[in-house]
From Swiss-Prot:
Signal peptide (residue range): none
Organism, as annotated: Human herpesvirus 6A (strain Uganda-1102)
Identification of the protein by name: Triplex capsid protein 2
Keyword Cytoplasm recorded: no
InterPro entries, sorted: Herpes_capsid_2 (IPR002690)
GO molecular function terms noted in the UniProt entry: structural molecule activity
Family: Belongs to the herpesviridae TRX2 protein family.
Cellular localisation: Virion; Host nucleus
One Gene Ontology cellular component annotation held by this UniProt entry: host cell nucleus
Primary location: virion
């Protein structure tokens, strides 16, 4: 078990200490593996104070080290770096209830001007990520990517209604609104990666997939396979030579195409999916705390 000590530049008042004691078991990211840090390296405030873009903060958060607040000792916090496979009590900082078996990830705050501040000391405040189920994190990423792509070639007044609908997400009876999109360098990189990947999939996948679908339908007459075969037959012209004996070079070329398509699919997944940090084992009655296994 690795311990990190965070010392505050300002002297903590009794009120500050009381506030921090209520935040036990909260997940706090730090920039890198260090045994001793200052409050300036604690949480997301150094990032969100200079850049409000959700995608930018999310990309930085993905590179940060996870710690869990264990206790307050005088003017410092004691944080624990979780160990893979071990159980920890984790505080629910997100808006969504957790359920047993949930896989949890970290996302940036959805609002940069939350009415409820965890702790504010001078010009610094404690800003932590939301711990949410991976399913809703992926849905948020997908919608933000869709909005960004649509916004590239359309005027805002053309798509205002659609964007308003996409920005509202209801999950487990909780309604949230997505942050505004900023088409900066980070967002443009995501959109460029998505477009390149989709272009390569569109170019290479139909022919090789139709070959495999045609062979599979000979063995399996499921309606879904047949419908896929009908769909592909309208879009592709089957190369009859592929149905015969393939030479070694042709097999190698085919394998390269399959690997390329799967790699591009993985690229898109990396834009939308978040890694799992915790798996929920048990949830408290008020759903504000859970026993979780650390998986990262």
């Amino acid at each position: 078990m690795e311990t990190v000590y965070c010392t505050f530049d300002h002297k903590l008042s009794l009120s500050d200490i009381s506030t921090l004691c209520k935040l036990m078991n909260i997940v706090i990211p730090i920039p890198a593996h260090h045994h001793l840090i200052g409050s300036g390296n604690l949480g997301l405030y150094p990032i969100v104070s200079s850049n409000k873009d959700y995608v930018h903060v999310r990309n930085v958060l993905r590179t940060m080290v996870v710690t869990i607040l264990q206790k307050v000792e005088g003017n410092q916090l004691v944080l624990r770096k979780p160990v893979t496979g071990h159980q920890y009590a984790i505080k629910n900082t997100g808006p969504f209830p957790w359920e047993k078996g949930d896989t949890l990830t970290l996302i940036p705050p959805l609002s940069t001007h939350s009415e409820e501040k965890l702790l504010k000391l001078g010009d610094w405040e404690l800003t932590v990520p939301l711990v949410v189920p991976t399913a809703i994190a992926a849905e948020i990423n997908i919608r933000l990517l869709c909005i960004g792509l649509i916004a590239v070639h359309r005027e805002y007044n053309e798509m205002q209604t659609i964007i308003d609908e996409l920005c509202s997400i209801q999950y487990r009876d909780v309604l949230i609104k997505l942050p505004d999109i900023v088409n900066d360098k980070q967002s443009m990189y995501s959109m460029k990666t998505a477009c390149i990947s989709l272009s390569m999939i569109t170019a290479m996948a139909p022919d090789i997939v139709r070959t495999y679908i045609d062979r599979l339908t000979l063995e399996d007459h499921s309606m879904l396979l047949i419908k896929c075969q009908e769909l592909l037959s309208k879009r592709t012209t089957l190369n009859t030579q592929r149905c015969g004996q393939l030479h070694a070079t042709e097999i190698k070329d085919e394998l390269k195409k399959v690997k390329s398509v799967l790699t591009m699919i993985d690229q898109i997944n990396s834009l939308t999916n978040e890694k799992t940090y915790f798996v929920v084992c048990d949830v408290s009655a008020d759903n504000r705390m859970a026993t979780c296994i650390y998986k990262n």
